[in-house]
Amino acid sequence: MTIIRKSHPLMKMVNHAFIDLPAPSNISSWWNFGSLLGLCLIIQIASGLFLAMHYTADTASAFSSVAHICRDVNYGWLIRYIHANGASLFFICLYLHIGRGIYYGSYMYKETWNVGIILLFLTMATAFMGYVLPWGQMSFWGATVITNLLSAIPYVGTGLVEWIWGGFSVDKATLTRFFAFHFILPFIIAATAMVHLLFLHETGSNNPLGIPSDSDKIPFHPYYTIKDLLGVFIILASFLTFVLFFPDLLGDPDNYSPANPLNTPPHIKPEWYFLFAYAILRSIPNKLGGVIALVLSILVLAFFPLLHTANQRSMMFRPISQLLFWTLVSDLFILTWIGGQPVEPPFIIIGQVASILYFSIILVLLPVAGLIENKILKW
């Protein structure tokens, strides 16, 4: 087996990526989320494939086809809830993975980090289009509101929105193309994830200390395969418990009503994992300004490598940066809460303050903290 593993062209690639890969000896469980994201993607593609076999991408029958999956298809309800809650699991792992990258300075691997940002955008696009497919009230109005934001783009906005819609409103053409894109994008995500891994394996993994670990490397297998498997079992057990006991906890009750263009839901809001960005969008009274802030709320991640001023890579020994990091995490929780609230006082001002704080911490306070810490440590 050893001979094949090191000589066969295909096996050699797998060997270099997952078996004989030299890995730092001190990476913690925060490094498990890469493999868990791979697991999430596999779960989503597999469950999505089975759903697509029974789903009908037509405005007249989309809602009914989802009901048919839940009622008449063998274990259809389970596949549907695994897929719906799998998206939430995906984003939980994604946000923890990004948080780890920020805390330990993994963003200094610029190519890996930038491909990761592209992956985040692709995943968000996929999740948004998937939410439209059941053709419930929140599906329809969410699609209308979010696609309509593009009309804020000067000169080409209106034409662009109608081009995406395939008509003058969200209708059959929109649903059909969203299904097509929702089906193809996960495979594009899988290919991009391979590029992400390719760039990562050029440099090797970072570690909690943020120092070079070339002098102390261990093989990925069996050490980290076993460690990843532990994470997989914990996540799968938690996930299945959630799916089987609280399948609708994260969903919107409005989405159990068929789409009705004549009846607007009282509070239009996206799924929980987009609420922080939605809160930032709503905190700016101007439409174009809101759209720019929405895009920047994710694109701001690209500024981390450019604004790294500290002489240490990791935040492990930088208390001021640690304080700011956890303030940022708290701020994101506040933004998520505000995104789900109606647009009325005191939520408006809380959202605006939280949005300003979000950009201030990333663009101003963290770089300044890095410089202060350099001075304190006489680096």
From Swiss-Prot:
Keywords (A to Z) from UniProt: Electron transport, Heme, Iron, Membrane, Metal-binding, Mitochondrion, Mitochondrion inner membrane, Respiratory chain, Transmembrane, Transmembrane helix, Transport, Ubiquinone
Annotated positions binding heme b b566: 97, 196
Subcellular location: Mitochondrion inner membrane
Transmembrane portions of the chain: 33-53, 77-98, 113-133, 178-198, 226-246, 288-308, 320-340, 347-367
Chief localisation class: mitochondrion
Pfam families xrefs: Cytochrom_B_C (PF00032), Cytochrome_B (PF00033)
Cofactor note: Binds 2 heme b groups non-covalently.
GO cellular component, as recorded: mitochondrial inner membrane; respiratory chain complex III
UniProt membrane topology term: Multi-pass membrane protein
Xref: CDD domains: cytochrome_b_C, Cytochrome_b_N
Residues where a ubiquinone binds: 201
Cofactor(s) for this UniProt protein: heme b
GO biological process terms, semicolon-separated: mitochondrial electron transport, ubiquinol to cytochrome c
Subunit structure: The cytochrome bc1 complex contains 11 subunits: 3 respiratory subunits (MT-CYB, CYC1 and UQCRFS1), 2 core proteins (UQCRC1 and UQCRC2) and 6 low-molecular weight proteins (UQCRH/QCR6, UQCRB/QCR7, UQCRQ/QCR8, UQCR10/QCR9, UQCR11/QCR10 and a cleavage product of UQCRFS1). This cytochrome bc1 complex then forms a dimer.
Similarity comment: Belongs to the cytochrome b family.
Additional observations: Heme 1 (or BL or b562) is low-potential and absorbs at about 562 nm, and heme 2 (or BH or b566) is high-potential and absorbs at about 566 nm.
Function field: Component of the ubiquinol-cytochrome c reductase complex (complex III or cytochrome b-c1 complex) that is part of the mitochondrial respiratory chain. The b-c1 complex mediates electron transfer from ubiquinol to cytochrome c. Contributes to the generation of a proton gradient across the mitochondrial membrane that is then used for ATP synthesis.
Protein name: Cytochrome b
